[in-house]
Amino acid sequence: MVLKSKGSVLDLEHDNQTLKDYISVFERNKMRLTQSRLMLLQCLVQHRDWHTLAELKHHLEQNQQRTTLASIYNNLKIFAKLKLINIFVDTNRFETYYCLRHENHKHIYFFDENQRKFLTLPLQDKEALSLIGHKSKHGKIKLNDFYIVASGTLEDDQ
């Protein structure tokens, strides 16, 4: 599968390599890569921003890929299980955002209302662990599986 892109040749080559890398995760885990999963992966690679379910459905439909929200949701859960994507919940809007996991990382996130994008809050791992430490004592939440999304605006001097 080769991605079609309106971007530069370098972007297209990077996107194709990225897609191949994600496909190899399915192969290593002996997971079936269905056409709908491949199309969803391709959509996430091409549109690197954060996505809601509705946005993903819209992107797929623009490329003549008929699908349902339930199918997209189920595939995203599989992607999360394989650690291909991060899932973030904006508690003010009750919206869930999905993004490809380009590297293994630990962050606390902030959604900047003005810029309409996620930024990393300047917390060290120990500070983050202390914020959720009461839950991690029971072994149910690991730092890498727990993300905080705060809303508001981030000033330049912060």
UniProtKB/Swiss-Prot annotation:
Gene Ontology MF term list: DNA-binding transcription factor activity; transcription cis-regulatory region binding; zinc ion binding
SUPFAM superfamilies documented for this protein: Winged helix' DNA-binding domain
Signal peptide: none
Pfam families: FUR (PF01475)
Gene3D superfamilies: Winged helix-like DNA-binding domain superfamily/Winged helix DNA-binding domain
GO terms (BP aspect): negative regulation of DNA-templated transcription; regulation of secondary metabolite biosynthetic process
Transmembrane segments: none
Protein name: Uncharacterized protein MG236 homolog
